[in-house]
Design a protein with these regions (language model features):
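Acidic, glycine-rich flexible loop segments
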Residues: 372-405
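Low-complexity intrinsically disordered tracts that form flexible linkers/tails across taxa
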Residues: 365-378, 757-763
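Solvent-exposed beta-strand/loop surfaces of large extracellular or lumenal domains
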Residues: 60-61, 218-219, 460, 705-713
Length: 805
């Protein structure tokens, strides 16, 4: 046989042997790999979608579908790591004999509240170094609530919710850590799903998933000129992978005046008729409970319907909420319908994500005369509601109580408004840890109010007006654009994060107002205003306005922690506002905070009953915008008339001095805090001590003329100080598989003081503020150096009679 044939035979044989060996190896590998299938459920048997199933030590992983099922190919004998937010992570050992897995995850109580929303992002609760209180849906105030603010009742130390009236039209007033301004805004900034400047009345209480309250300066400084009064960040129910489900909730509530003011009865009043100390007492021969005549037991109802579903790539949530609330004062009510839809879509293994949220609310509400309750308390209890002819009884003079029944029945005051919030967000994650997002948002508010008085109203009986009509219509459009990039990276025990962003906000507010009196008939109500005699005689009042306002901001934040033991955060915002003077349109708002997690130290690590113990310190500077435009500019207003060229011509005169140095009020705050958790989170809480000073307070001051054109001027002068301590304590008294009973308590103490009202240029010792309604007509408060804001000022009781009257 030739040699070349031998070589060919040997070469072919070697190739054949190689192919056989490779085939055997593939068959061996295939024989070692198996498909494992299973389902993941919670302790109550509910399937869990979106659970991460990962082959331990590899990048081989899958997620459960909407029914909680999964399938993964791996080598038998390896382990699976099963993780899900809010549940204890499990490690499952596999084998070749069992390829069908039924996995149960237990709820992790300590992790349920582990994510806290901060400005333009979120952090683990253990890494937070500022004074932030996070309240989740499971911990909201139970029962029917009239407004979303009420969900926080008793849950946040330092947050004061005030309801001064039974009027269902008015919501709750909120203040955080005292009053920080004399003439600017005193309410916290509301951020809804990332949109700043929202209103809680625009959303349904049932649609809220969590509320995070940013209380101190180091937390709120990232919001710049709007963070002085704190920030409330609301996250609504979000679309996520889950089985399609439909939920309906309904509730009914009753409300009444629980305790009436202790006033004289008709018999008590009659006994004073012959008392020389009380001249002018008149016994009109009847017994009338005026408060009872204008009040009622109010019935309210709420209906909420929601739909949600979708898979890991595309999911949705939609809801509709209807509320009807009566007020305890007759002819007061509020009716609203709110609809929401949220859509999520993820592409390219979650590297590209889209979010769309639309929330629309329509409200109609009816008001009663603002001083009805006050006049009911002041009215003569022996006076009848109607005279013998069926007409309302009236004193027919000013500075006497008005018949509150007539004031309610003969006045029409109805308001309707629509609030629309829309936002779209796109997020790109090109590499691990890096997220680049762009968000565009639009908020639109349209309102119309119509008010009229009949011929039987006090204004006709006393003043002879023969009907009054007021009509208001206004519209506000807010457009927001935000670009945010954040990057997180861990190097062993070193964890760092960087965030930078840009924000642009454009507000456009416009409206019209008209007033007239003297109807030929009161059958028209607030309509057909053109038929009023005032319109024909050119005595009616009409006006319109338009205001625009812009905010431009650049902001950033750096975070670092070493082994989640030593933590540091610094942020900075550079913001410009069109409302301020030419010399101070831009400002810097820095913040820094640090934390030490003592429970991570070796000397406390073996203390089994201690879950977490963290010390915090933070300092931040925030600003407070003025509430109006053009306050820094030289303005002219219409003045008197002059007879020029054969006709009367209205002139113009200066009414506001320019102030190019007008700027925002500035608040600096130092906060010391301690967070703790014991006994596997059965007992947890926080303690905070703070010191805040608001300087450059805005107020109007008298100035000499000349050199000034007008005798008053808006300027930054005063200073307010707030100091206080806050305590939040939460405990789980009962915790079983089917029952959990939590107790939460808060304590807060705030000492407020007006430090100064004057400086070298502007002087003012005090001024009066607030007023009572008719017929008393006097001031109620005084603003004075050394006093707290809101200090009452008025007459004091001199003495009591022997009868205690």
């Amino acid at each position: 046989m030739p040699k070349f044939n031998q070589k060919r035979i040997i070469s072919g044989t070697m190739r054949l042997i190689t192919m056989v060996c490779m085939l055997c190896m593939c068959q061996f590998i295939t024989a070692q790999t198996k498909n494992f299938q299973g389902v993941v459920k919670d302790s109550k048997g509910n399937t869990l979608p979106g659970v991460t199933i990962l082959e331990t030590g590899t990048t081989n992983g899958v997620s459960t579908d909407v029914d909680g099922h999964f399938e993964i190919k791996m080598n038998p004998g390896n382990t699976l790591t099963v993780s899900y937010i809010g549940y204890v992570t499990r490690t499952i050992q596999t084998n070749a004999n069992t390829t069908s897995l039924n996995i149960i995850l237990e709820e992790d109580v300590f992790l349920l509240d582990d994510v806290v929303v901060v400005g333009y992002g979120s952090m683990k609760k253990g890494e937070v170094t500022s004074a932030i209180t996070s309240v989740k849906k499971d911990n909201f105030l139970a029962g029917m609530v009239k407004s979303p603010e009420q969900l926080l009742q008793g849950k946040v130390a330092g947050l004061q919710l005030s309801n001064y009236t039974g009027d269902p039209v008015l919501g709750l007033e909120m203040t955080i850590r005292g009053v920080n301004s004399l003439s600017g805004n005193t309410s916290p900034l509301i951020v809804i799903d990332g949109i700043p400047g929202g209103s809680m009345t625009a959303i349904s209480s049932e649609d809220i998933e969590s509320i995070d309250v940013l209380k101190d300066g180091s937390a709120a400084a990232i919001y710049g000129t709007r963070g002085t009064n704190g920030v409330i960040v609301i996250t609504t129910n979000r679309a996520k992978a889950t089985k399609m489900s439909l939920e309906y909730n309904a509730s009914v509530s009753f409300e009444t005046i629980s305790k009436h003011a202790d006033m004289l009865t008709a018999n008590d009043y009659r006994r004073l008729k012959d008392d020389p100390d009380f001249p002018g007492i008149q016994d009109e021969g009847t017994t009338t409970d005026w408060v009872d005549a204008i009040s009622r037991t109010a019935v309210s109802q709420n209906h909420f319907l929601s739909l949600k579903g979708g898979n890991a790539q595309s999911n949705y949530v939609a809801s509709i909420d209807y509320r009807k609330r009566e007020g305890v004062i007759n002819k007061t009510d509020r009716e609203s319908i709110t609809a929401k839809i949220g859509l999520n879509h993820n592409m390219f293994n979650d590297k590209l994500r889209f979010q769309l949220n639309i929330n629309d609310s329509y409200v109609t509400q009816q008001r009663a005369w603002y001083a009805a309750y006050l006049n009911a308390l002041l009215e003569n209890p022996t006076r009848p509601i109607y005279d013998e002819n069926g007409n309302y009884t009236e004193y027919k003079v000013n500075l006497k109580p008005y018949n509150p029944v007539a004031m309610i029945n003969e006045e029409y005051d109805k308001e309707g408004y629509n609030q629309l919030m829309m936002s779209g967000k796109m997020t790109i994650s090109p590499i691990e840890g890096l997220n680049l997002s762009v968000m565009g948002a639009l908020q639109r508010f349209d309102r119309m109010e119509n008010k009229s008085n009949t011929f039987k109203h006090m204004s006709t009986v006393v003043n002879g007006d023969y009907g009054n009509v007021w009509n208001w219509a206004d519209n506000t459009l807010q457009k927001t654009l935000e670009l945010v990039g954040d990057y997180t990276k861990s190097f062993g025990v070193h964890n760092m994060g960087v965030m930078a962003g840009y924000s642009y906000q454009d507000d456009d507010d416009k409206g019209i107002y008209q007033w007239a009196k003297d109807f030929p008939t009161d059958m028209f109500g607030p309509w057909n205003i053109g038929s009023m005699n005032d319109m024909k005689d050119n005595k009616a009042a009409m006006t319109s306005y338009r205001n625009t306002h812009k905010l431009i901001s650049f902001f950033g934040r750096v975070t670092y922690n070493y082994d989640e033991k030593y933590m540091f955060m610094a942020s900075l915002r550079r913001e410009g506002s069109s409302r301020f003077g030419d010399n101070h349109k831009w400002g810097w708002f820095p913040a820094v905070s640090a934390g030490w997690r003592l429970s991570k130290e070796n000397f406390l690590r073996d203390v089994k009953w201690l879950d977490d113990l963290k010390f915090r310190v933070g300092y931040g500077v925030t600003g407070n915008e003025v509430n109006a435009n053009l306050l820094s500019m030289y303005l002219l207003g219409y003045g008197g008339y002059a007879y020029i060229n054969g006709k009367w011509t209205q002139g113009a005169a200066p009414y506001q001095n320019p102030n190019p140095d007008l700027k925002w009020e500035t608040k600096s705050e130092l906060n010391l805090g301690l967070d703790f958790s014991f006994l596997k989170n059965r007992l947890s809480g926080s303690i905070d001590v703070y010191h805040r000073v608001t300087s450059d307070l805005l107020s109007t001051y008298e100035v000499p003329t000349p050199p000034y054109i007008v005798s008053s001027m808006m300027a930054n002068v005063g200073k307010i100080r707030n100091r206080g301590i806050e305590l939040l304590l939460s405990g789980t008294a009962i915790q079983t598989r089917d029952l959990r009973f939590d107790i939460t308590g808060t304590f807060s103490y705030n000492k407020n003081k007006i430090v100064s009202l004057s400086n070298g240029l502007y002087q003012k010792d005090y001024w009066y503020a607030g007023a009572t309604g008719s017929p008393i007509q006097t001031h109620t408060h005084i603003v004075k150096e050394g006093d707290p804001v809101g200090n009452f000022h008025g007459f004091q009781t001199h003495s009591l009679t022997s009868d205690g009257l």
